[in-house]
UniProtKB/Swiss-Prot annotation:
GO cellular component: cytosol
EC number(s) recorded for this UniProt protein: 6.1.1.15
Family: Belongs to the class-II aminoacyl-tRNA synthetase family. ProS type 1 subfamily.
InterPro entries the UniProt entry points to: aa-tRNA-synt_IIb, aa-tRNA-synth_II, aa-tRNA-synth_II/BPL/LPL, Anticodon-bd, Anticodon-bd_dom_sf, Pro-tRNA-ligase_IIa, Pro-tRNA-synth_IIa_bac-type, Pro-tRNA-Synthase_IIa_type1
MF terms in GO: aminoacyl-tRNA deacylase activity; ATP binding; proline-tRNA ligase activity
Keywords: Aminoacyl-tRNA synthetase, ATP-binding, Cytoplasm, Ligase, Nucleotide-binding, Protein biosynthesis
Localization (cell): Cytoplasm
Assembly, per entry: Homodimer.
Domain remark from Swiss-Prot or TrEMBL: Consists of three domains: the N-terminal catalytic domain, the editing domain and the C-terminal anticodon-binding domain.
Descriptive protein name: Proline--tRNA ligase
Catalytic activity: tRNA(Pro) + L-proline + ATP = L-prolyl-tRNA(Pro) + AMP + diphosphate
Species whose genome carries this gene: Sulfurovum sp. (strain NBC37-1)
Amino acid sequence: MRFSRLLIPTTKETPNDATLASHIYLIRGGFIQSVGGSGLYNFLPLGKKVLDRVRNVVKEELDKAGCQEVSLSFVTPASLWEESGRYEKYGKELLRFKDRKNNEFVLGPTHEEMMVNLVRQSVKSYKQLPLNLYQINLKFRDEIRPRFGLMRGREFLMKDGYSFHTSEEDMKREFDLMEETYKKIFTRLGLEFRVVEADSGAIGGSGSKEFMVLADSGEDTIVVCDNCDYGANIEAAVRQEKDCEAKAPEAEAGKVHTPDTTTIESLSAFFDVDPYYLVKMVAKRALYDEGKSEVVLFALRGSDELQEVKACNAVNANDLADISEEELETAGLIAGYMGPTGVPEGVRVVLDNNLKDATSMICGANEKDHHLVGNSFEGMEGDYHDLVAVQEGDLCPKCGAPMRYTKGIEAGHIFQLGTQYSEPLGATFLDENGKAQPMVMGTYGIGVSRLLAAIIEQNHDDRGCIWTKESAPFDLQLIVSNIKDETQVALGEKLYEALTAKGLDVLFDDRKDRFGAKMKDYELLGIPYAVVIGKKLQDGLVEFISREGLVKEEVSAEAILDVVGERV
């Protein structure tokens, strides 16, 4: 393709709202164009080329794994979402609207309901299963604050796949196959990534894994062990149970006057004990469907922090909200002196697993200026869950080595759904005995347009993009330094024809612009390799450039085709 005929509106100006390298360079390089700053983007020719290349990698690996591609309607009847129970639960990110006949619809942010509807009409027997269907299609989520370009837009291209099985064992087999398939996809795209345990969120299900592209700019905090392969999103990370070498408090069970000790720090100082032996109480309002709510006290050791996603899941709430001191008083609670026993009626208590059988604990007495000492949880019944946010240095649950935080970009997510959608939507099959059974499901997603941003977040420098081989819009850029030099132009045309004949996708920069401007554009666009025909041609030399590191090498004009054949 000739540069002079392509729409590539490069610019030196950085968008005002752009902070991430991917957002800056994709706009400046003319790959994408913002539609009024609303989290919507047009893909220009170069961006569409990259998008198609990434899409093809995804499609090729899925097809090899036996998946079948379909295309579902972007507009979804609201009735399907009502059947699954997600119409209200999904929240304001679900864009709802009515047509001229007053029928209700949504713009699909995900397509579990639509795919189940397709399969329940088409599959009747166990002989038709297993089945893995996928699409690579547009999605829309009405994000409250779309930001970071393609990283968190409102409309995006997503691969979403859904598998249907006769048993949980067969679903888990497919889940493992999809994990390996996703690894192949991200490896082909040249990405450094980590597969981590994850929270299932609004999709639901009993188990899920995320594919995190490692990048300092990532929104997600992940916990990893460098000694083994354990990794987890902070929302789902677990650890080995903590011990404490500090001496336990030696006090007989009783109530102690503790004025002005409303924090863990002040309580620790008052009793001269490690926070490990204190009970921290975190009050939240749990929000449920149909406007229902309740006050919940989450109890954990004073040395730990509450992980709110875990806490929300523990009470099966849609969300957790902070509670003011006035609301606490209305519920009969006293800020700074709350405890897990003797709570007012109507207040729910959830205990962290690390409190099971704990002894010598100090907790609030649910009475102003008083705490209880010598508390024991041995044999105490209660609603126990993992509520703790794993900290750096906590020990790996698999191998016992210290873990650390790192940042990642969620580029893929796979779920074991079970019968969560098939049962309410009536997706059944007849088994060998002619009995109707609900289909067991898995679902598998990849943010295809987000991958463009993820690739650049991991592969860029201060001059522009550095596309990986499988994602690059072109294999090589051919640059004629001086378009007025007939010898340079003649060699450029000859090389362009020869390289194209070899099957390479070449961007031929035949513009009349200054050589410096052409090189700036090459560095910004980030095509993996370039051949520059310049002044050294009079000595029989051209320049071969690798975009990564901008490594330059002089090569004889006669040998350049062989060099390109070896390197590109």
